[in-house]
Design a protein with these regions (language model features):
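Active-site-adjacent structural elements that line small-molecule/cofactor binding pockets in enzymes
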Residues: 1-308
Length: 308
């Protein structure tokens, strides 16, 4: 049971230097991991490589890198290089992203579950052996590179739908979710992931749950703020589906809100449900205020009970 921080769900409005300072601060505060979503800002693997030189123990993770714009050979080589640079602390989270964004780039969003299955299998061979001769339905690849100082890294996928959870259970090291609340995790995500893992005769996998988080004594108004800040996720097909699985109206219903005692109780419920890693995206309770200092102070105290 681990607690980490997650940025990228909202525009960070931070330059590269400030992002690295935030990661250094996260390690000093005792957070177990720091997760980046690849958005329209800095390249996350480059940021991780830079942050890794300033930190020692914190896991640094991508949550997630869209794959349709990256050939698996290119991503495998880059990830192995970054992993070596940060003393093998990288968690490589990948996902197909969303149809509208992929098609805006002139690419086909085709058979995403099969595509990700083959992509993970290729990544696994390249990052563990340094070579592959892969013949699949989508990819036909013969490639190699020298693995220098890099050990095999966990490969996670952003699995929310049933077919993707099957892929995650059979070939990946687990799933990374966003906007999956307790009900969706208990009834849908974790049972399907575990069933797929068991059928493939694999052990327990990581369930990484990303959740918006805010310390507040005014839950009603903070929920309104959450609804405004995260409203886009209620419109994207993949997230809308997981919200429906959780029987909630919108993203604000998933946000973790309250004082320290209330938040500690909510966090415990996620771990009781079978989540292995809880990655929290702090947001300010005031729509005009981007300060997350009180969030981090409170979360640091709660995380100390788990990250030992």
């Amino acid at each position: 049971m681990k607690i980490g921080l997650f940025i990228g769900a909202l525009a960070t409005k931070m330059n590269l230097h400030d992002q690295i300072k935030m990661i250094i601060d996260a390690e000093k505060r005792g957070f177990d991991s720091f997760w980046f979503a690849q958005t329209g800002e800095t390249d996350v693997l480059t940021t991780i490589a830079l942050a890794g030189k300033e930190t020692e123990n914190i896991e640094l993770a991508t949550g997630v890198i869209p794959t349709y714009t990256r050939h698996p050979h290119v991503l495998a080589q880059q990830a192995a290089t970054v992993n070596a640079a940060i003393s093998n602390r990288l968690i490589l989270g990948i996902g197909p992203s969303h149809r509208p964004g992929v098609e805006r780039l002139g690419l086909k969003y085709d058979r995403p579950a099969l595509y990700i299955r083959e992509y993970v299998e290729i990544l696994r061979e390249l990052t563990t052996q340094g070579h592959t001769n892969y013949q699949g339905d989508i990819f036909n690849i013969e490639s190699s590179f020298n693995l220098i100082d890099s050990t095999p890294m966990p490969i996670m996928i952003s699995a929310l739908a049933p077919m993707m959870l099957k892929v995650a259970g059979e070939v990946a090291d687990g799933t990374i979710t966003w906007m999956a609340g307790l009900t969706a995790l208990r009834r849908h995500v974790i049972p399907k992931l575990n069933a797929a893992s068991a059928s493939a005769q694999r052990g327990q996998l990581r369930v990484v749950a990303g959740v918006p988080f805010s310390v507040t004594d005014d839950i009603r108004n903070t929920k309104i703020v959450a609804g405004e800040k995260f409203q886009v996720y209620g419109r994207l097909e993949n997230y809308r589906r997981i919200l429906d699985y959780g029987e909630v109206e919108g993203p604000s219903d998933v946000a973790m809100l309250g004082n320290e005692v209330q938040l500690a109780e909510q966090i415990a419920q996620y771990f009781d449900a079978g989540v292995t890693d809880l990655i929290l995206a702090p947001f300010a309770s005031d729509i005009q205020d981007e300060s997350n200092l009180s969030n981090l102070d409170t979360l640091q105290g709660i995380a100390a009970e788990y990250n030992v």
